[in-house]
Amino acid sequence: MSKISVNIKGFDSQEFPKGITPLQIMNDIKGVPKDTIICKVDGQLTDLSSNLNKNCELQFMDAKSKDGHSVLLHSTAHLMAQAVKRLFPKTKVTIGPFLENRFYYDFDVNSPFTEDDLLEVENEMIKISEENLEISHKVKSRNEALAFFEKIDESYKVEIINDLDKDETLKVYSQGEFTDLCRGPHVHSTGQIKHFKILSSSAAYWRGDEKNQTLQRVYGTSFQNSKDLKKYLQMLEEQKKRDHRKIGKELDLFFFDDEVGPGLPLWTPSGTVLIDELEALAKEKETANGYLRVRTPHLTKGDLFSKSGHLDHYMSSMFSPMDVDGIDYYMKPMNCPYHHKIFANTPKSYRDLPYRISEYGTCYRYEKSGELFGLMRVRSMQMNDGHIYCTAEQFKEEFINVCNLYMEYFKIFGIEKYEMRLSLHDPEGLGDKFIDNPTLWKKTEEDVRNALKGANLKFVESVGDAAFYGPKIDVQVWSSIGREFTLATNQVDFAIPERFDLSYIDKDGSAKTPLCIHRAPLGTHERFIGFLIEHFGGNFPLWLAPKQITILPVSDKFNDYAQQITTDLRTMGLRVSCDNRSEKIGSKIRDAEMQKINIMVIVGEKEVENKTVTVRRRFIKEQKEMSLNDFSDEILSEIKERRVSN
């Protein structure tokens, strides 16, 4: 039998019989961790049961690795689907992908799952795990796969297969009596899936389209050991407490109304304070960085978005046009084309560059009803948008300056963990998902990569996630409880300057095309405020808090003094309320803490006599008597510095 050479990461290169599987190699050599669940062959995730037929690089992986964990999650989704089919045989299975630390599977069932149903499913999953069923796969032709799933009456799988090319070859994975259509890879037995939990269920639409069949989506999670599972479940409990929808309602920050429409948030006075403070911060930072403020309309003729390429590449995320005098008008999904028009409105020379403009522009994007989620996925959003038009020589410095602006914001908000993700195009999507200009893609991506490296900024790369018009930096941040958010973006648009015939006069008198950087360091108000609510748990720092101070008279006879202090502090621009209810002071303090008011100012007989105030910080029992001037100086300084802790 012929031999192949296998270079195993962490081991010496060895020869094995052609056709051997990674699982067999695991059993042949000493030192491979027992908790290995998957492998990479020449950098590609591969089943342990796959045959190796040529010389290769082999790496064994456990579920602690990101790739290994994704495989474990995916395999647990199949385990859950098998349990559901055992308990509810008439159920139709659809799809079951993995997410970040979670998975889900969509089922077509006669009635929604109850809590008892889900507990029964979880118990059945434990039984299947204990059966330690081998998970194997076969490659089938499209017709073979179609015949198989038609025979077992899995109509959703049949629909998926019918949408594929006729010459497509498919994989099916089997474990015991259960077989699923899947690209894989998967763990090699159900016995490797031991530490899991069903989390919740909700309604979903087949293929995300509300016109299609309503399904039951069941979420779950899975980890390599019980310790990691427990830690994740504890984090989920903390997330529930900090859910921006829950806290937003408790603090009366925003709400949605059926008569207004889904995904269209209404901001209350308290929520509007958050918006105003963020805009003031952005204006301050952008002015310091040489940006000019602009304003643009909410709709436009379709011609503008045809020229920009949005109608070709972004139409599915735009609202339907409205007919005005026989012309199609669209609500804007982005501010970019308007900014290009502003740049082109007056002649520019090289002396005018870099030309930086910004605005908080309201955009409208169509999101399917099933994908809307509080402030995180909405249909109306206020975006911290801006564009920089510069020469090729200025590009690197301008791009890095935007990245540095992110760092300034993160420091202000106490965001300690973040990651820059360089999103690149996928060559297979040229002409469809991405503008068809491979030469420009290659050059622009390399320019961005070199700029990041030159500034010693750490980043990871993600193929296929670029904007249709150019590469971009997506900034991932983690809240104080460890949840990941996509927050900001810094994009290079190499197509727009030519599409809009943007130009400037260079030193030699010739017309040149500028480069365009599109940036949104704070993303949208909606998503960023949703993040901040969770990050701070609603306990906003003093400068940002909608309700900064409340004055608490200990009895009615001190109401006049309390009201005078309230008026004095308000004239200083502070957000102050006065609780002059006939309640005990302990009750007033508890109510103020429930409202997450930062500072309680207590006034009674002693304070009136001494012309002072007694100050109590949120959640701190210690109180301090101060003159009103000393108190106001202290808090105004804290607000000016935008301190995170208070």
Please annotate each region the language model reported.
Residues 1-94, 100-646:
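NTP/phosphate- and nucleic-acid-binding module
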